[in-house]
From Swiss-Prot:
Modified residues annotated as N5-methylglutamine in this record: 149
Listed name of the protein: Large ribosomal subunit protein uL3
Gene Ontology MF annotations: rRNA binding; structural constituent of ribosome
Species classification: Bacteria, Pseudomonadati, Pseudomonadota, Gammaproteobacteria, Pasteurellales
Subunit structure: Part of the 50S ribosomal subunit. Forms a cluster with proteins L14 and L19.
Transmembrane segments: none
Organism expressing this protein natively: Actinobacillus succinogenes (strain ATCC 55618 / DSM 22257 / CCUG 43843 / 130Z)
Biological processes, Gene Ontology terms: translation
Gene Ontology CC: cytosolic large ribosomal subunit
Length: 208
């Protein structure tokens, strides 16, 4: 089963019949329109390419416009691809949120919020050094970053200060709380990566 592209609306909570509060993220999943079907013969693998939402005509490049016209669909805000295994799709077909009606858990992929250049304490959860006891300058610095003449260098991958966030993140096995096909909404338990209104990819959970 393929996934769908949606938009993170925000977080709220829903109550069970027992009065238990469940924190949920609301994901709006408008119809995903098929723009290309990739086959083993033509492309070397099988996949389906989709778009969703809309884009101003002035923002659509000529190659994009031709691609959308060929598929017979309205220009969307992007193109996404999902590998397929045996599923049949046709150009222009619309795939809706109700495909998750019988799914218990999903994996959600998004781009995490960018936080700019951050130090080791925020970025890697390093401990801070002593507030006093002779320490007047090095409260939040890394400390030692290696040895001496051997190896005489800092190992690659050493955790240091640097750019935090704004990277692709997947949160796995989030419970599906509600599928509202009429309003095109999917409610999942817990938080998903990204800012409000950012695009997210929702797939049936790999580890479910």
């Amino acid at each position: 089963m393929i996934g769908l592209v949606g938009r993170k609306v925000g977080m709220t909570r829903v109550f069970t019949e027992d009065g238990v509060s469940i924190p949920v993220t609301v994901i709006e999943i408008e119809a995903n329109r098929v723009t290309q079907v990739k086959t083993l013969e033509n492309d070397g693998y099988t996949a389906v390419q989709v778009t969703t939402g809309s884009k101003k005509a002035s923002r659509v490049t000529k190659p994009e416009a031709g691609h959308f016209v060929k598929a017979g669909v309205e220009a969307g805000r992007g193109l996404w691809e999902f590998r397929t295994e045996g599923e049949e799709f046709t150009l222009g077909q619309e795939i809706n949120v109700d495909i998750f009606a019988d799914v218990k858990k999903v994996d959600v992929t998004g781009t995490s919020k960018g936080k700019g250049f951050q130090g080791g304490v925020k970025r890697w959860n390093f401990r801070t050094q002593d507030a006093t006891h002779g320490n007047s300058l090095s409260h939040r610095v890394l400390g030692s970053i290696g040895q001496n003449q051997t190896p005489g260098r800092v190992f690659k991958g050493k955790k240091m200060a640097g750019h935090l966030g704004a990277e692709r993140v997947t949160v796995q096995s989030l419970e599906v709380v509600r599928v509202d096909a009429e309003r095109k909404l999917l409610l999942v338990k817990g938080a998903v990566p990204g800012a409000t209104n950012s695009d997210v990819i929702v797939k049936p959970a790999v580890k479910a």
